[in-house]
């Protein structure tokens, strides 16, 4: 899965000469890829998906700040094992998957700007992630369903996803992250098409990538 995420990101971002960390938060796992100058040097799959961590650390807890604190400690322990972070501090950090696309849309909305149809390539600061996490933690799941920029289907799991994201940013000492609207499904399409790490020239493949952009 990490390899598929990387194929997708490498098609949409110029990473030559950069030290990059790509994160894809799914339902059950977090896929991490560390790359230097466009070449993958490390990968990890951690049990830190948004659904899994909601079930293990968030669901049923009345004291949300305490639950989030516990999840963040758990995430930090897992993340420390994933990469030699002393070698990966302050990287270009790219997030793909629904947690990140929803984060991007909410961040734009919180700035008082119109939420665009595509959030691909937008940037969210670490401070914005922390502020959104703190704010969403004070809302019930029903209230989160009405948050501008948040897909109602993610109202139950967004807090856990952002808690993991916040720890990732902190551990990487990154000031911001860049949102990719393309993830595992797109990586699979690219692999099936035998595409190289450039934007595909086939218009049918381009259309398929747009249709399956993460929500």
Label for each model-derived stretch:
Residues 1-19, 34-36, 42-215:
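Helical "lid/coupling" subdomains associated with nucleotide-phosphate turnover
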Residues 23-25:
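Catalytic cores of RNA-modifying enzymes
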Residues 28-34:
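Acidic, divalent-metal-coordinating active-site segment for phosphoryl/phosphodiester hydrolysis
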């Amino acid at each position: 899965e990490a390899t598929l995420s990387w194929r997708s990101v490498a098609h949409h971002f110029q990473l030559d000469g950069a030290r990059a960390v790509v994160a894809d938060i799914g339902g059950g796992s977090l896929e991490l890829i560390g790359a230097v100058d466009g070449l993958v040097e490390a990968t990890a799959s951690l049990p830190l998906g948004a659904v899994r961590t909601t079930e293990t650390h968030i669901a049923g807890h009345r004291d949300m700040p305490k639950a989030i604190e516990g999840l963040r400690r758990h995430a930090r322990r897992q993340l420390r094992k994933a990469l030699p972070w002393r070698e990966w501090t302050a990287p270009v950090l790219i997030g793909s998957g629904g947690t990140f696309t929803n984060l991007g849309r909410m961040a734009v909305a919180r700035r008082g700007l119109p939420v665009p149809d595509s959030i691909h390539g937008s940037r969210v600061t670490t401070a914005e992630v922390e502020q959104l996490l703190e704010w969403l933690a004070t809302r019930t799941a029903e209230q989160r369903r009405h948050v501008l920029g948040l897909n109602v289907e993610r109202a139950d799991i967004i807090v856990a996803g952002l808690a993991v994201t916040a720890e990732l940013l902190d551990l990487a000492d990154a000031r911001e992250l860049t949102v990719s609207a393309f993830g595992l499904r797109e990586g699979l399409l690219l692999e099936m098409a035998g595409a190289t790490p450039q934007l595909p020239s086939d218009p049918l493949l381009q259309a398929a990538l747009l249709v399956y952009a993460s929500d």
